[in-house]
């Protein structure tokens, strides 16, 4: 049985941990779950079968933390495990790989006094919202947004740069590509590149005008 003051808020809440690759999301998820386990809070941890980087029943963080997990293909499988094991806390890693049904599952758990902590990428390699994450952030009581360090300049990195033969991946590549340092690097906004990103003509004209204005300023400065 969980210790009396193990949960500091009313039972039935959602906490989301998000950010780019290499930001420590899984490490933070494991840390939080283990912290509650020290107070005898019963937990279950799930991860998508899509993610093949870890062993079948283990989640590994890049900092060496490990925790047991249940690999599932569909979000609704969580219900069966919860009914069987009756946890007070559910953790879900790599939540971006599930379809939108995960939002209903998370909401249902929280509505029924089960606390939920999820971790996942908030943006795909294009820098755009990833899968169900925007909806999850919208229903969460708490959001922890982590950053990594840009591999180009050392600034705060909020994006995951996909690399193919050490070159930025084209916008039209498949959204999901399971990989690690061989395929991805953390980047800040200004060093994140996505070739062939669709852009509106008005935006093109605006950017062209900005560049022309900047070039004129530089030219004038050189004359002065």
Curated annotation (Swiss-Prot):
Catalyses:
thymidine + ATP = dTMP + ADP + H(+)
Q: Which UniProt keywords apply?
A: ATP-binding, Cytoplasm, DNA synthesis, Kinase, Metal-binding, Nucleotide-binding, Transferase, Zinc
Protein localization: Cytoplasm
* Superkingdom as given in the UniProt entry: Bacteria
Q: Which GO terms describe its biological process?
A: DNA biosynthetic process; thymidine metabolic process
Residues annotated as binding ATP = 19-26, 93-96
One GO cellular component term, please give it: cytosol
Stored SUPFAM superfamilies: Glucocorticoid receptor-like (DNA-binding domain) (SSF57716), P-loop containing nucleoside triphosphate hydrolases (SSF52540)
Residues engaged in binding Zn(2+): 150, 153, 188, 191
The reply to whether Phosphoprotein figures as a keyword in the UniProt entry is no
Q: What is its EC number?
A: 2.7.1.21
Q: Which residues form the active site?
A: 94 (proton acceptor)
Q: Which top EC class is given?
A: transferase
Annotated Gene Ontology MF terms? ATP binding; thymidine kinase activity; zinc ion binding
Show the Pfam families listed in the entry.
TK
Family label: Belongs to the thymidine kinase family.
Q: How does it assemble?
A: Homotetramer.
Q: What is this protein called?
A: Thymidine kinase
What organism does the record attribute this protein to? Mycoplasmoides gallisepticum (strain R(low / passage 15 / clone 2)) (Mycoplasma gallisepticum)
Lineage here is: Bacteria, Bacillati, Mycoplasmatota, Mycoplasmoidales, Mycoplasmoidaceae
Q: Which gene encodes it?
A: tdk
